[in-house]
Amino acid sequence: MTSFKLVKYIPRIKKKKSGLRKLARKVPTDRLLKFERIFKAQKRINMSVFKAQRVLDEIRWRYYEETVMILNLMPYRASYPILKLVYSASANATHYRNFDKANLFITKAEVSRSTIMKKFRPRARGRSFPIKKNMCHITIILNIVKK
């Protein structure tokens, strides 16, 4: 007879997203001016959606100055294109709408999938190996807040 060990099946517990914690620090909606918003999008960024999402989760519902400080100190490669996008959105807000940078607030920061760039790498014996590079679109909406 062969002996085998009985292993009890332990289901994996999924880690909950910290959405409530993020929403708890959001500015009250009565202080947000509804129609005073700046929309900025960057398309086809050479980065995975999941890597960009990790950085965007940290800057959502924060003031502009705090966001710039966080993005400068983050060690991720994804923070640099997002920092350029936030700079550009704030420059648009000050140039076109005469908004003050101290009153700017990030209300929406989202990332969506883009196309996949496909390349082929030559391998041994005349074979080829596909390389898939993921790309994403990043959208940021800045609102002005009454202080």
UniProtKB/Swiss-Prot annotation:
Pfam families: Ribosomal_L22
Cell location: Plastid, Chloroplast
Chief place of localization: plastid
Keywords per UniProt: Chloroplast, Plastid, Ribonucleoprotein, Ribosomal protein, RNA-binding, rRNA-binding
Superkingdom per UniProt: Eukaryota
GO MF term (any one): rRNA binding
GO BP terms: translation
GO cellular component: chloroplast; large ribosomal subunit
HAMAP family, per database record: Ribosomal_uL22_B
Quaternary structure note: Part of the 50S ribosomal subunit.
Function comment: This protein binds specifically to 23S rRNA.
Family: Belongs to the universal ribosomal protein uL22 family.
UniProt-recorded name of the protein: Large ribosomal subunit protein uL22c
Gene label: rpl22
